Structures are given as C-alpha cells and as structure tokens.
Amino acid sequence: MSQQLPDVQATEPDVSVGLSEVGVTGVEKLVEIAREDDRPIVLMAEFEVYVDLPRGRKGIDMSRNMRVIDETLEDAVREPIYRVEEMCGEVAERLLEKHDYTTTATVEMNAELMLREETPASDLPTQGTIDIIASATAQEDAPTREEIGARVVGMTVCPCSQQMMSETARRKLAELGVGEDAVREFLRDVPQAGHSQRGHATLTVEAGGDPDVNLMDLVSVARDSMSARIYNTAKRPDEDHMTYESHANAKFVEDCVRSMARGVVEEFDHLPEDAVVTMKQSNDESIHQHNAHAERVAEFGQLREEVGSGE
C-alpha cells in the first residue's frame, strides 16, 4: 500500500503572517450573456480568483484549488447569465463555501465587448470595442459586494491651448478690420484649434448585492464624459462632426471625471447611498511625452451631495 504524501500546504509557515489574497490569474473562459429575444453575447473572459490565507497555513493547495476554481467557473458559465457581476458573485460565494480556512473570496473578470453602432453624420455601420470590468467579494457574515463597469476610449481637447488660439484669432481678425461683434460670433460658432488627446475613461459601480445598473448605460456615461466619442469607420462628414464636437466641448482631464460624476448621479439616482463609484480618466498627450490622469472614488451619497451643491 502506497504511503500518502504529506499535505505540505497545511503545515505551519516559516513566517506566521496571514495573506490577504492568494490565487490564480489569467484563467480564460467563454462566457455567454443571455438576452431576451436575441442571440447571446459571447465573451472571451479572463478571470482572477483569490482567497485569503490565515497566518497558520503555509499555502492554499494551489493545484487542487485550481480544480475547484475551474469547476466552479464551469458550473457558473453553463447556466444562463444575464449580468456578469452576478456570475462573479456566485463564483465567489461557492469558493467561500468550499474553503474552510478562508473568510474572503474575490473574483475579478475582464473581457472585451464588440459594439455595433453607426457613425454620427453619415450613419455608416461601424464597430468598436470596450473593456468590461466585473468583480465580486464574498465574506463570512457579510453581504457579497458586486462591481460592474467598463473602460472606454474617446477624444479630448485641451481648453488652455484652445483659449490661446482663440486669442490669436481674435487679434488677427481685429487687425483685418472685423468688428468686435462679428469676431465674437465667429469664435462662438467656429471653435478654435487646441491640442487633442485620446482619452481613456474607466467607470465602475460597486454595491452590496446586485448594483442594479445597466452596463450599456454606464458605457454611455463614460463615453459622453469626454469631449467627443470616436468611431473606427468615418467618412469626411463624420470626421468633421468629431472634430467640431470635440473642440466645441474642450475638457481638461479633471473635467472628464467630474462629468462622469454628474452623469452617474443623473442616470443612476436609485443607487444606495453606500454604493462605491470609481471614476478614472487618463489622456494620452499629443504634445508631451507624459500623460494626464485624474480619478475619484466615492460613495454615491457623497457624490450626489457634491454634484447637487454645485447646481
């Protein structure tokens, strides 16, 4: 009879320090999001799955734990999925049940979603991608918290450089004898040049249980927080539209985050006060080697109070 191998992971570690997260990353699964009266959306999703580890245990049984994780994910993705954050919550809760030495389980999911839409001026069919972000954390004796959100790309224009160009245009028009009222009307109707950036907006909402927000509504708030939306396919009228819209709506990186805050408050006024909203904006500078970044993390109640006080 073969001798059973020792369970090394269950032994005492050399250093008795607990770990907040131990697990696996880069777990790829096909996920189908069910839709009523339509074909499901198929995602190639990548998961990160973690549990906490008490100070008296050396490891988490990585190989066996991976099998548990894989089986749990497979069970979850076989069932009809309407909200990916709910799926993450279910997986986290199952993992917590199957690990008697852990008190917290976290599941994070990232996936790329292809959007079909039309260009703004010529109505050409076009496609673009967004990154879906979903996660959940299950804890003993506490409601599971779920998060849903997206990373999107858009365009921004710097108000400062635009203002300098407007002043240059104002002086030149005055030198040419154009009246002050005509100059003012021209500058109002024809936004002046400013250096542009490709903007990256991230917007997520986390709440106890289901955040109860529509993913595509979150995407719209994030895209509209920048100076203009962008499109992969574009005829000249579409290029003109994007250029005009972005310059007529010039924004600093800080403005984009504040626009997201206002959009969340207006679009999701049903959210609980303790829902956590994360808003990030990163702009790829066109005239500098560095980039610009701004962000805010706040509970919805605080965000609503701040947005309301500014009206």
Swiss-Prot record:
Its cofactor is Fe(2+). Pfam families: GCHY-1. The record marks C158 as: May be catalytically important. One of its GO terms (molecular function) is iron ion binding. One of its GO terms (biological process) is tetrahydromethanopterin biosynthetic process. It comes from the Archaea. InterPro entries: GTP_cyclohydrolase_FolE2/MptA, GTP_cyclohydrolase_MptA. It is an enzyme of class 3 (hydrolase). Keywords: Hydrolase, Iron, Metal-binding. Its EC number is 3.5.4.39. Belongs to the GTP cyclohydrolase IV family. Converts GTP to 7,8-dihydro-D-neopterin 2',3'-cyclic phosphate, the first intermediate in the biosynthesis of coenzyme methanopterin. PANTHER family: GTP CYCLOHYDROLASE MPTA (PTHR36445:SF1). This is GTP cyclohydrolase MptA. It comes from Halobacterium salinarum (strain ATCC 700922 / JCM 11081 / NRC-1) (Halobacterium halobium).
